[in-house]
């Protein structure tokens, strides 16, 4: 495991009680929030606009900063700081660029899809506590 902090910006997109998650071609069995790393000089919102366009071909609206989460990046196995924004989408998302698939989850779907630890252990509980993602059932 490397000790270099990875900074990531991600979107929590909830529709019809389900959270949008994506998998990467490099690790198609693990699902993350859509988003990515900022380019030099790019702020968090600009990063998210660029990443969602590149990865899903959509533009987010109503960006609201939810929280910063710290953990270990599932793919890189390095310390991570993930800034998460709530957003809605204009258009239908489709996986592109480095993405393999997308899925919608309640977070209580068992191991389908397999969620990255930060999503499973931090983001989903935060979304439930804030009322953005309801408990299933």
Spell out what each predicted region is.
Residues 33-66:
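The catalytic Nudix box helix
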Residues 1-2, 135-137:
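Actinobacteria-biased recognition of intrinsically disordered, low-complexity terminal regions
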């Amino acid at each position: 495991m490397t000790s270099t902090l990875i900074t990531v910006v991600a979107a929590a997109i909830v529709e019809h009680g389900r959270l949008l998650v994506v998998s990467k071609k490099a690790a198609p069995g693990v699902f993350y929030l859509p988003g990515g790393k900022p380019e030099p000089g790019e702020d968090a919102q600009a990063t998210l606009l660029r990443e969602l366009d590149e990865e899903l071909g959509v533009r987010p609206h109503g960006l609201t900063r939810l929280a910063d989460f710290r953990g270990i990046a599932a793919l890189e196995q390095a310390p991570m700081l993930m800034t998460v924004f709530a957003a809605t989408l204009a258009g239908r998302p489709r996986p592109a660029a480095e993405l393999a698939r997308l899925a919608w989850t309640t977070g209580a779907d068992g191991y389908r899809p397999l969620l990255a630890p930060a999503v499973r252990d931090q983001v989903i509980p935060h979304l439930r506590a804030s009322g953005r993602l309801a408990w299933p059932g």
